[in-house]
């Protein structure tokens, strides 16, 4: 009985590993855009948090300090979107596998 339980657990772990690889590839291909000031500044990042694009409306260029703050705000919004998408996608990859509280994926 113990042997069958262990084999089942190993199979489940292998399936989770395959799902994790697929999910990580999906995350790498993901792009999200955060924006600030009603779209005057847009920042696009990948699921790996790599900066892809920054779009700035010409009207936002008059005040340098404000523009700097808007870029940070737009990036922070995009970052939060990736965090949420990552958590949702990873929870699907680990479905059925008990994880310790506070355990974060990917490793």
Curated annotation (Swiss-Prot):
InterPro entries listed in its UniProt record: YbaB-like_sf, YbaB/EbfC
A Pfam family that the UniProt record links to this protein: YbaB_DNA_bd
Gene Ontology CC annotation, any one: bacterial nucleoid
Domain of life assignment: Bacteria
GO MF annotations, alphabetized: DNA binding
Subcellular localization(s) per the UniProt record: Cytoplasm, Nucleoid
Keywords on record: Cytoplasm, DNA-binding
Gene3D superfamilies attached to this UniProt entry: Nucleoid-associated protein YbaB-like domain (3.30.1310.10)
Role noted for this protein: Binds to DNA and alters its conformation. May be involved in regulation of gene expression, nucleoid organization and DNA protection.
Record-stated family: Belongs to the YbaB/EbfC family.
Subunit structure: Homodimer.
Protein name, UniProt field: Nucleoid-associated protein Pnec_0645
Lineage of source species: Bacteria, Pseudomonadati, Pseudomonadota, Betaproteobacteria, Burkholderiales
């Amino acid at each position: 009985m113990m042997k069958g339980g262990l084999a089942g657990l190993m199979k489940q772990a292998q399936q989770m590993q395959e799902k994790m690889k697929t999910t990580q590839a999906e995350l790498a291909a993901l792009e999200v855009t955060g924006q600030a000031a009603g779209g005057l500044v847009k920042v696009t990042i990948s699921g790996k948090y790599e900066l892809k694009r920054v779009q700035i409306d010409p009207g936002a260029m008059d005040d340098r300090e404000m523009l700097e703050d808007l870029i940070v705000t737009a990036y922070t919004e995009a970052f939060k979107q990736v965090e949420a998408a990552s958590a949702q996608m990873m929870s699907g990859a680990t479905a059925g596998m008990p994880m310790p509280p506070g355990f974060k994926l990917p490793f």
